[in-house]
C-alpha cells in the first residue's frame, strides 16, 4: 500500500511537479510495524512517517505552522485510515484499474509536466521514490475516484427548480429588458362607457396579435397613443429599476421573451407590453444559426469522395429545380439524427460544430445552400434557414449555478458517505496517539 500525497482525478490529473516537490523519501530507519488495521488492510509505520513528512513539507512551503506532534499524527493517521476504508469498499464492489488505464494516466501526468514518460519516471526516482511504488499509488487513487463517482457524485442530482430558486435570490438589477408598448389612453375622469370602449379596443388588438393577424409593432404604430408609437412601441433597453412599476410587475409575474402580457390598467389607460428580449447588462451575445443538411458518408471503397460529391451535386440540382430540401434530406441523408427532421440541425452556437461544417455554414446567407463539402463525417450540402442574436449570459449563469449547487451537494453527501463507510468498517488502531 502507498501513502503518497492524495491525488484528485477529476478533470486533469494534478501537476506532478507540485506533487514531486512535496514528496520526500521515507526514513530508512523506520521500523515497518502495523499501526492500524482497516478491514483486511493495514497501515504501516513507514507509511505513516512518510505521510507525516510529506504533509509537513507542504504546510511549511505555504508558511503554515505545524500542529503539535500528537495532534498532527492523529490527523494524518485518520487520513490514511479513511483512504484504506475507501480502498476496501472499492475492492468489495469490484472496482479495478487495469494496466492500460494506469499507463494512460501516467502518460497524461508526464505530458502535463512537459515530460516524456521516461523523464517523468526519472523525476519521481530523483525524489527518492521507487517508481512502481508511485505507480501503484496512482492506481489506488483512480480506484478511489471511481468509487466516489459511482457512490456519491452520480447519486447527486440538481433539479431545475433548485437552480431557479437560487436565480430568484440574485439581484436582478443587472438584467435589462427590451419592451414593446401599446397604450389605449383614457381621459383623466373617464366615464364607465369610455373605460369599457377603451378596454374593448385593446382586447381586440391583443386577440389579433395573438392570432397572428397583425404583429405587435404594426399594431403599436397604427393604434397606440404612447409616445413610442412611431418606433413600433419599442421602449429600448431598460434596467428592471427603470421600468414603470406596472410593466415590472408583468415581468416579475413570468412574462417570457416573445410573449404579450394581458391587459394592464392604470390612470393613463389600458396597456399591452411585449417582452421583445432580455439580456444581462454587459452580457454575452452570440449569433445562433439554424441550418439543415444532407450527409453522404464515404468508406473509401464502395462510396468514394467523388461518388459522394456527385450524389450531392445531383441532389442540389433537384433542389434548385424546385424539389423540397426537407423531403430529399429525409429520403437520402445518412445522418439519422437529422434526416427524420428534414435535415434540420436546430439552433447552434459558434464552436458546436466541426470546423469544416461551421466554416461552410458561416459563409452562407439566410436561404443560401452550399456547394458539396467534406467533413470528418462525410460529404454535405447545408442550407442556412435562420439566424438570430441571443444573449446567453443567463443560460451560462444557470449552468454555472447548477454546477455550483451540484458541487456543494456532492461535498455534503461525501462527508456523510465517508462517515458511514468509517462507521461500517473494522478499524483497529495499534499505536497510542
From Swiss-Prot:
InterPro entries in the cross-refs: OMP_Chaperone_SurA, PPIase_dom_sf, PPIase_PpiC, PPIase_PpiC_CS, PPIase_SurA, SurA_N, Trigger_fact/SurA_dom_sf
Keywords: Chaperone, Isomerase, Periplasm, Repeat, Rotamase, Signal
Protein task: Chaperone involved in the correct folding and assembly of outer membrane proteins. Recognizes specific patterns of aromatic residues and the orientation of their side chains, which are found more frequently in integral outer membrane proteins. May act in both early periplasmic and late outer membrane-associated steps of protein maturation.
Catalytic activity entry: [protein]-peptidylproline (omega=180) = [protein]-peptidylproline (omega=0)
Superkingdom, natural source: Bacteria
Signal peptide: 1-28
Domain (PpiC): residue spans on this chain: 174-277, 286-386
Cellular compartments annotated: Periplasm
Domain notes: The PPIase activity resides only in the second parvulin domain. The N-terminal region and the C-terminal tail are necessary and sufficient for the chaperone activity of SurA. The PPIase activity is dispensable for SurA to function as a chaperone. The N-terminal region and the C-terminal tail are also required for porin recognition.
BP term (GO), one: protein folding
One MF annotation (Gene Ontology) recorded for this entry: peptide binding
Enzyme Commission designation: 5.2.1.8
Leading EC class: isomerase
Organism per entry: Alkalilimnicola ehrlichii (strain ATCC BAA-1101 / DSM 17681 / MLHE-1)
Family matches, as PANTHER family: CHAPERONE SURA
Name of the molecule in the record: Chaperone SurA
Gene Ontology terms: cellular component: outer membrane-bounded periplasmic space
Amino acid at each position: 500500500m502507498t501513502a503518497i500525497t492524495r491525488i484528485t482525478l477529476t478533470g486533469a490529473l494534478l501537476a506532478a511537479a507540485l506533487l514531486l516537490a512535496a514528496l520526500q523519501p521515507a526514513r530508512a530507519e523506520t521500523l515497518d510495524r502495523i499501526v492500524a488495521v482497516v478491514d483486511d488492510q493495514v497501515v504501516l509505520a513507514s507509511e505513516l512517517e512518510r505521510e507525516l513528512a510529506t504533509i509537513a513539507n507542504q504546510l511549511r512551503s505555504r508558511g503554515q505552522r505545524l500542529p503539535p506532534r500528537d495532534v498532527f499524527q492523529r490527523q494524518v493517521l485518520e487520513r490514511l485510515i479513511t483512504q484504506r476504508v475507501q480502498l476496501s469498499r472499492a475492492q468489495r464492489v469490484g472496482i479495478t484499474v487495469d494496466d492500460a488505464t494506469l499507463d494512460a494516466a501516467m502518460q497524461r501526468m508526464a505530458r502535463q509536466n512537459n515530460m516524456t514518460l521516461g523523464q517523468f519516471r526519472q523525476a519521481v526516482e530523483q525524489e527518492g521514490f521507487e517508481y512502481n511504488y508511485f505507480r501503484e499509488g496512482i492506481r489506488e487513487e483512480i480506484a478511489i475516484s471511481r468509487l466516489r463517482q459511482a457512490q456519491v457524485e452520480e447519486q447527486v442530482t440538481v433539479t431545475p427548480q433548485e437552480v431557479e430558486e437560487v436565480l430568484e435570490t440574485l439581484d436582478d438589477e443587472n438584467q435589462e429588458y427590451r419592451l414593446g408598448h401599446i397604450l389605449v389612453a383614457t381621459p383623466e375622469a373617464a366615464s364607465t362607457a369610455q373605460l369599457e370602449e377603451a378596454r374593448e379596443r385593446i382586447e381586440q388588438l391583443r386577440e389579433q396579435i395573438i392570432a397572428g393577424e397583425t404583429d405587435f409593432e404594426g399594431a403599436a404604430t397604427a393604434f397606440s397613443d404612447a409616445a413610442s408609437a412611431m418606433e413600433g412601441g419599442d421602449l429600448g433597453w431598460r434596467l428592471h429599476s427603470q421600468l414603470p412599476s406596472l410593466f415590472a410587475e408583468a415581468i416579475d409575474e413570468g412574462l417570457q421573451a416573445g410573449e404579450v402580457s394581458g391587459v394592464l390598467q392604470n390612470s393613463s389607460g389600458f396597456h399591452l407590453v411585449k417582452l421583445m428580449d432580455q439580456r444581462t447588462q454587459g452580457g454575452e451575445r452570440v449569433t445562433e444559426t439554424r441550418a439543415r443538411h444532407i450527409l453522404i458518408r464515404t468508406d473509401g471503397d464502395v462510396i468514394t469522395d467523388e461518388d459522394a460529391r456527385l450524389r450531392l451535386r445531383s441532389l442540389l440540382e433537384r433542389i434548385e429545380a424546385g424539389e423540397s430540401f426537407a423531403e430529399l434530406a429525409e429520403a437520402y441523408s445518412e445522418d439519422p439524427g437529422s434526416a427524420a427532421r428534414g435535415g434540420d440541425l436546430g439552433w447552434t452556437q459558434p464552436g458546436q460544430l466541426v470546423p469544416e461544417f461551421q466554416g461552410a455554414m458561416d459563409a452562407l446567407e439566410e436561404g443560401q445552400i452550399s456547394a458539396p463539402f467534406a467533413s470528418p463525417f462525410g460529404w454535405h450540402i447545408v442550407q442556412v434557414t435562420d439566424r438570430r442574436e441571443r444573449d446567453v449570459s443567463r443560460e451560462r449563469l444557470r449552468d454555472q449555478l447548477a454546477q455550483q449547487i451540484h458541487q456543494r451537494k456532492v461535498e455534503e453527501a461525501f462527508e456523510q458517505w465517508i462517515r458511514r463507510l468509517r462507521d461500517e468498517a473494522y478499524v483497529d488502531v495499534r499505536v497510542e496517539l
